[in-house]
């Protein structure tokens, strides 16, 4: 390989590199750096371009010198990072003279400072007399290159005029010593300082041009113009002489020097594998194949012949590909017509035959099989139908109706306002109005115009409906559902039954191993980003009222993928402080992008920071956000010792660039008044508190609303009006539910003290310290809110004080994060579950829930106080139904009173806790006592109630459950029979102990069934026919172990009938029946499961909650007397017990498979029965042929022949190798990627993480 002339050698002025020591190397690097830094000609040029050419210099010195300064990273990795990340700039450290890499600043990235230069689309360019035009580049292309910093305005002018190429060639020729060239035929660079700077500047400009795609244009244009014009040497030389005016050199020598330069340039890119996939593949390929001879001999016949032959081959390949595509399309259309005309069964049978013969894509073979199976008339019918369809395609292709342009605008537009206008124009052309079952046809041409689901989708998008709403409304068009599984869970896709377009999809995550409500990191980090974004709303000024939930949801969708894309963020059990810090950085970068977008696009909603002007500079916003971030999240930052302010600033800058690159400019939508009103009600603390109280006292269900009807019922119960009634009278909301008071947020920070009070609720709630106590904490917070209600004027100052407390609380929480580690066996997953938790008691006074009599509070009395002291009366107490009648805007809600003990809500802490505990214990004792004697009588036997009183013991029926209405009767009866109760309780305990110590008796003879059983072989035959298997396979359930599957299928080698009740076959078949019955009962009673099994949930996912409840009524009970009969036969006749279990399995299967009504259940039960019985048989197959894997479980088509595969060679199932005859097919493979250059960033993505 020829030695490459590099700029490093130029700057060194001829010094022998091999003779340099370490100090001289450092001095040389300093000299290069200072030369670039001090040159005015290259002031605005990024150092990446110049230092890039030091590759050969550094590699050469590293190979020859053994004591080099240690570089911060390997050279190959350094070059790779330069290519992959154009925003990384190498610098030379002033202290250690090492090559380092740091992120570039915005000033270095955007060099043009917003300047745009208009360039004609066909600017003339002249190179060696060849008058070319820039047809390959448009002005937009040049503008884009200028925007990303590839060119300065001056450079852009060079590109447009071609001066960068011609000037560079001139300077290159000036820098070549003429005498040396004539002697050796090689160029030696002249070492004057002016030539160095000029050469360097021109080289960098040319390199940028080539790197941006100019190499492709350069070679194509030179080759094309020279071949077509067929210039001879004299003409070419005359043109060159006109360009090179400064020196009298032979034209032929000039061309040789250009070839020398191009060869050297291509050689530089071929030194390392990194550059073979870089920016010069075309130039390198031309040089390697000898095509640069075009510059030397324009009429080279070999080049022309090769180009002509290659073009012919490409045309032939295109024709073959088009013909193949047409044939395959015709074959597929044949099958579609067959399904419609002669039936699905016959079509599948023909498809199976042709698939085995390898002719499934041959239309002629399809017609021949149709003639064999159905007759010649059916084949002619298929051919005629296909010709009609093809003619329809041709007519549609030639159609020039005006609706085509409108549909194209509709499907490619971005602004919903414009799309609605286009949609209105399209609706005018509808042949039928209000069509939702088929294509909307054009009344002008008669062809398909628009699918109804697209019409509805455009309307929903214009109304800014949520994804869930759109998916729900579009489901009525769904007719094709597909399901597949990936690492995230099951993906369900829904397709339109009219046009086949995808409507929606969602992921049902596999949560069988999750612990708690939120068990995976994705949900935790998503919630963290959502919560922190909502907190950021406190300092953001939106200008108008916006949907803050939409703001947070967009932030999650934007930031979450970017956080996960960071290399050192791993999806572990729980996210660490570093992950939280990255999430906060991207949240604030998203906020900065919103501010930046509102400044750039005036149509967007104006977004700024409270206290800052809307036209403030971007640097001011960056400074504020960085300071806010470091102040607000100092608790997180303090946990990371290696994090500095500069690190945060650098990552914030990179996050902002990534968000701009990925999302561009972003804006937010403004809410309407109706939505704002309902949102304020539902999210307000009053509604939340009222709904919580209503759930506690049983007015509404404990669970959240699951249907619109349940949501409307909850709203009406809590508010007193339906949403429609409330919206019609907004003044009603203003009068009753608007208060001038605000809560004292400083007191909320002191809620931490509640955790450490003496009395605990954990004793009374059986250890449920999360769900119940969280509700009590809310009630405690409301008590504080009422207690400090009068501090409304100091609200703003106290809010600021609360924010300072929040930081300290975060630090305290970080210190408490040193949690214990536990390995707990999880019975759901069958493996150890790793948890970290403090198991810390959350303590609240018991009087928050119960009064001094042990009764739960009922907060049903509302206490209103007059806003004005002159108003009479000063205080009003009303029930919920009287609020509308008696309360106006002169009164504000002040407190709640318990209707049981008449204590005010904020005074529950003053109740005597000892009395509450004593009353609760007494209540527990009474409950146990009266539950014990609910049916039995202390006098013996059962109660004999006459006129609601037992004539034997004197117990009244109304005191069994109500212990407070008649306390004297309750205590008298309790005192009379307490001793008797204690004796009977001890007697029961002693009997239980005696039972535990007694040796169990031997198994008694089981009772015979009520009806005798006789074996019916017809059930097995019928089941086998439905499953398309041999009856012998069903008979072999429980007896496949150790047998060849071929023998099982033929009924050979079956073991003799069992003779013992302990035969393992009986237990195996009985287990299969029990599994079938268990899964069936899960399906029948699916409405009772909080989380049903996945295979059952998949079957009923489309049913409503009411339909799931009806499954228990419409599905039959198939158990009957199975267990009784099996137990009896197992002891008396084991052989009959085996046959009975197998027959019962088939009878249960047929009972479910043959269900005819109701229609909405048929498909569910049939799919369940087929899946369950096939699973049992497939599981049994795995036990056949011990010592070898049974390929038959994948179906008979997988195995090469129907013979016994126990002795098959494993090589029959392995893929073709890379040696011998296998390599022949590989050479002819047109899809091989062996010779394709793969970009290094792709290789990085393929590397193991």
Curated annotation (Swiss-Prot):
Annotated protein name in UniProt: Minor capsid protein M1249L
Entry's localization field: Virion; Host cytoplasm
Domain of life where this protein originates: Viruses
Keyword Membrane: no
Induction: Expressed in the late phase of the viral replicative cycle.
Lineage per the UniProt record: Viruses, Varidnaviria, Bamfordvirae, Nucleocytoviricota, Pokkesviricetes
Keywords: Host cytoplasm, Host-virus interaction, Inhibition of host innate immune response by virus, Inhibition of host IRF3 by virus, Inhibition of host RLR pathway by virus, Late protein, Viral immunoevasion, Virion
One GO BP: symbiont-mediated suppression of host cytoplasmic pattern recognition receptor signaling pathway via inhibition of IRF3 activity
Function: Together with the penton and the other minor capsid proteins (p17, p49), forms a complicated network immediately below the outer capsid shell, stabilizing the whole capsid. In addition, blocks IFN-beta transactivation mediated by the cGAS-STING pathway and regulates the transcriptional activity of IFN-beta. Mechanistically, suppresses the phosphorylation of host key adapter protein TBK1 and degrades host IRF3 in the cytoplasm.
GO cellular component terms attached to this protein's record: host cell cytoplasm; virion component
Keyword Ligase: no
Assembly mode: Interacts with the minor capsid protein p17 and with the hexon capsid protein p72 capsomers; these interactions form a rigid zipper structure that stabilizes the capsomers. Interacts with host IRF3.
Principal location listed in the UniProt entry: virion
């Amino acid at each position: 390989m020829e030695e490459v002339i590099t700029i490093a050698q130029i700057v060194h002025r001829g010094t022998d590199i091999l003779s340099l020591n370490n100090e001289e190397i450092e001095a040389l690097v300093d000299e290069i750096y200072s030369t670039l830094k001090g040159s005015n000609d290259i002031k605005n040029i990024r150092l990446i371009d110049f230092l890039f050419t030091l590759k050969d210099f550094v590699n050469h010195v590293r190979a020859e010198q053994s004591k080099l300064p240690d570089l911060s990273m390997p050279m190959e990795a350094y070059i790779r990072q330069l290519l992959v990340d154009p925003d990384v700039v190498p610098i030379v450290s002033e202290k250690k003279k090492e090559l380092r890499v740091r992120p570039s600043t915005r000033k270095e990235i955007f060099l043009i400072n917003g300047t745009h230069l208009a360039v004609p689309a066909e600017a003339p360019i002249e190179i060696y007399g060849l008058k070319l035009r820039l047809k390959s580049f448009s002005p937009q292309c040049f503008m884009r290159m200028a925007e990303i910093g590839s060119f300065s305005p001056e450079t852009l002018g060079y590109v447009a005029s071609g001066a960068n190429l011609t000037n560079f060639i001139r300077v290159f020729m000036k820098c070549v010593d003429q005498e040396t060239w004539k002697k050796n035929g090689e160029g030696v660079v002249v070492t004057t300082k002016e030539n160095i700077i000029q050469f360097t500047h021109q080289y960098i400009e040319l390199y940028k041009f080539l790197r941006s795609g100019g190499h492709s244009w350069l070679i194509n244009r030179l080759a094309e113009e020279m071949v077509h014009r067929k210039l001879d040497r004299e003409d070419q030389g005359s043109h060159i002489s006109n360009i090179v005016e400064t020196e009298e050199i032979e034209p032929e020598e000039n061309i040789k020097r250009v070839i020398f330069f191009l060869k050297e340039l291509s050689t530089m890119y071929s030194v390392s594998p990194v550059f073979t996939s870089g920016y010069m593949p075309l130039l390198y390929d031309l040089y390697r194949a000898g095509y640069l001879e075009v510059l030397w001999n324009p009429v080279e016949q070999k080049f022309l012949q090769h180009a002509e032959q290659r073009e012919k081959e490409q045309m032939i390949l295109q024709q073959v590909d088009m013909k193949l595509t047409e044939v395959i399309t015709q074959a597929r259309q044949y099958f579609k017509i067959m399904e419609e005309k002669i039936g699905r069964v016959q079509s599948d049978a023909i498809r199976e035959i042709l698939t085995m013969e390898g002719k499934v894509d041959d239309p002629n073979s399809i017609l021949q099989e149709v003639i064999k199976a159905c007759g010649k008339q059916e084949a002619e019918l298929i051919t005629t139908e296909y010709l009609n369809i093809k003619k329809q395609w041709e007519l549609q292709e030639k159609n020039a109706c005006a609706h085509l342009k409108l549909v194209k605008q509709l499907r490619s537009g971005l602004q919903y306002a414009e799309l609605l206008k286009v949609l209105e124009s399209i609706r005018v052309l509808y042949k039928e109005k209000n069509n939702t079952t088929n294509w909307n046809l054009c009344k002008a041409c008669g062809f398909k115009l628009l699918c109804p689901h697209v019409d509805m989708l455009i309307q929903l998008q214009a109304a800014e409906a949520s994804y869930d709403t759109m998916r729900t409304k579009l489901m009525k068009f769904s007719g094709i559902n597909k399901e597949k599984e990936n690492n995230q869970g099951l993906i369900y896709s829904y397709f339109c039954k009219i046009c086949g377009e995808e409507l929606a999809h969602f992921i049902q995550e596999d949560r069988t191993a999750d612990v708690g409500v939120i068990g995976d990191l994705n949900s935790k980090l998503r919630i963290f980003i959502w919560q922190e974004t909502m907190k950021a709303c406190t300092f953001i000024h939106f200008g108008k009222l916006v949907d803050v939930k939409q703001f947070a949801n967009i932030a999650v969708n934007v930031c979450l993928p970017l956080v996960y894309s960071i290399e050192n963020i791993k999806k572990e059990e729980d996210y660490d402080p570093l992950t939280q810090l990255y999430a906060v950085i991207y949240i604030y970068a998203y906020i900065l992008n919103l501010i930046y977008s509102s400044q750039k696009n005036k149509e967007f909603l104006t977004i700024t920071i409270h206290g800052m002007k809307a036209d403030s500079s971007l640097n001011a916003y960056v400074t504020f956000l960085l300071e806010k971030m470091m102040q607000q999240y100092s608790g997180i930052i303090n946990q990371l010792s290696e994090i500095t302010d500069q690190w945060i600033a650098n990552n914030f800058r990179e996050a902002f660039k990534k968000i701009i690159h990925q999302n561009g400019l972003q804006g937010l939508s403004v809410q309407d008044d109706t939505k704002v009103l309902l949102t304020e009600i539902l999210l307000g603390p009053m509604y939340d508190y009222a709904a919580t109280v209503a759930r506690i006292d049983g007015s509404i269900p404990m669970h959240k609303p699951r249907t619109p009807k349940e949501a409307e019922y909850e709203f009406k119960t809590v508010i007193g009006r339906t949403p429609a009634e409330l919206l019609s009278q907004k003044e009603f909301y203003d009068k009753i539910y608007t208060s001038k008071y605000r809560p004292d947020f400083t007191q909320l920070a002191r809620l931490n003290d509640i955790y450490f009070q003496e009395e605990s609720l954990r004793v009374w709630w059986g250890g449920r310290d999360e769900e119940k106590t969280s509700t009590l904490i809310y009630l405690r917070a409301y008590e504080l809110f009422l207690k400090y209600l009068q501090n409304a004027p100091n609200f703003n100052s106290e809010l600021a004080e609360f924010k300072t407390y929040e930081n300290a609380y975060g630090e305290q929480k970080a210190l408490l994060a040193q949690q214990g580690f536990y390995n707990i066996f999880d019975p759901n997953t069958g493996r150890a579950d790793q948890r970290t938790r403090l198991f810390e008691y959350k303590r609240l006074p018991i009087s928050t829930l119960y009064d001094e009599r042990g009764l739960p509070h009922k907060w049903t009395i509302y206490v209103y106080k007059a806003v004005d002291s002159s108003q009479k009366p000063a205080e009003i107490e009303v029930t919920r139904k009287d609020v509308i009648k008696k309360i106006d805007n002169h009164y504000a809600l002040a407190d709640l009173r318990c209707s049981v003990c008449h204590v005010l809500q904020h005074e529950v802490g003053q109740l005597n806790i000892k009395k509450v505990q004593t009353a609760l214990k007494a209540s527990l004792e009474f409950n146990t006592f009266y539950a014990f004697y609910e049916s039995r009588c202390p006098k013996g036997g059962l109660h004999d109630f006459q006129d609601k009183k037992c004539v034997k013991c004197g117990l009244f029926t109304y005191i069994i459950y109500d212990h407070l209405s008649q306390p004297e009767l309750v205590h008298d009866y309790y005192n009379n029979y307490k001793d008797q109760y204690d004796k009977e309780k001890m007697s029961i305990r002693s009997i239980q102990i005696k039972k535990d110590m007694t040796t169990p008796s031997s198994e008694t003879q089981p009772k015979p069934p009520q009806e005798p059983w006789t074996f019916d072989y017809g059930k097995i035959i019928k089941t086998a026919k439905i499953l398309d298997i041999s009856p012998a396979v069903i008979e072999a359930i429980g007896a496949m172990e150790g047998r060849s599957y071929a023998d099982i299928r033929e009924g050979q080698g079956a073991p003799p009938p069992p003779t013992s009740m302990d035969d393992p076959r009986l237990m195996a078949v009985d287990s299969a029946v029990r599994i079938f019955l268990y899964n069936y009962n899960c399906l029948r009673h699916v409405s009772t499961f909080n989380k049903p099994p996945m295979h059952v949930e998949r079957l009923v996912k489309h049913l409503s909650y009411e339909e799931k409840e009806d499954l228990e009524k419409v599905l039959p009970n198939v158990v009957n007397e199975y267990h009784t009969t099996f137990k009896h036969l197992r002891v008396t006749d084991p052989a009959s017990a085996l046959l009975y279990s197998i027959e019962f399995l088939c009878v249960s299967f047929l009972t479910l498979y043959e269900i005819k009504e109701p229609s909405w259940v048929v498909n569910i039960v049939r799919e369940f029965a087929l899946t369950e019985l096939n699973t049992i048989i497939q599981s049994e197959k795995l036990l056949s042929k011990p010592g070898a894997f049974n390929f038959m479980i994948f179906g008979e088509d997988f195995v090469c022949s129907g013979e016994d595969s126990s002795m098959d060679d494993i090589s029959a199932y392995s893929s073709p190798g890379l040696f011998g005859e296998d390599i022949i097919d590989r050479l002819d493979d047109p899809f091989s990627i062996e010779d394709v250059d793969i970009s290094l960033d792709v290789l990085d993505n393929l590397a193991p993480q």
